[in-house]
Amino acid sequence: MNELKSYVFPAPGERVDASHASPETLELLTRRRSTAAINLGEPGPSEQQIEHLLGIAGRVPDHGKLAPWRFILFDGEARASFGNILGKIYSATTPEATAEQIRCEQERFVRAPLVIAVISSVLERHKVPVWEQELSAGAVCQNLLIAASAMGFAAQWLTEWYAYDPDVKDLMGLRSGERIAGFVYIGTASEQPVERNRGRAHIGRWKA
């Protein structure tokens, strides 16, 4: 299950196909659905699969070739350790929190076998606008979701309060100009997600 074939990333300067006609890819994108992190369990990706996931994640539009993102991985015992600290921070900043609410925060990162934090790491004084650099980090998150699904895993992209908490950012070693684009939870679905209502896109055509 979830076996990884031997895929090879192109080398710099190598010519690559401009298009990849693939009904399977269209089917995946047409029916892709996030799975709630609470419904993600073992097994998670192997080390080889994680390496490939991160490689795919970085194959996004990147104005200026800046690669303005980085990853922090949470797996194994590190998930519970980080969760315990989250619980302490939440308890300190939310004095009215109940024991059950604190426990919920402590268990945030053990819901899935693997959590990948995608850090938007922009160059603030670069000619490429910060907004465009941040969009690239968002595309990285989406690539992780799609690649995880293609590997046979389920995933969810979340932020939650701890993506914006200054103490959590310090704990994770974020530098000036860095923001958490999201936490991508990856594992095996314990149940199939149900499709949600999706609003119709507002589409217009510009006319001279």
Model-predicted regions and their roles:
Residues 1-111, 208:
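N-terminal amphipathic, basic helical "cap/leader" segment at the start of enzyme domains
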Residues 28, 115-117, 183-185, 205:
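Conserved hydrophobic/aromatic beta-strand scaffold that supports enzyme active sites
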Residues 57, 116, 122-171:
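Small-aliphatic-rich amphipathic alpha-helix that forms the alpha element of a beta-alpha
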Residues 76-81, 87-88, 122-124, 166, ...:
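Short, charged/polar surface micro-motifs in flexible loops or helix N-caps
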Residues 108, 172-198:
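A glycine-rich helix N-cap at a beta->alpha junction
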Residues 112-114, 151, 180-182:
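Generic beta-strand structural signal
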Residues 195-208:
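Phosphate/diphosphate-binding glycine-rich loops and adjacent basic-rich segments that engage nucleotide
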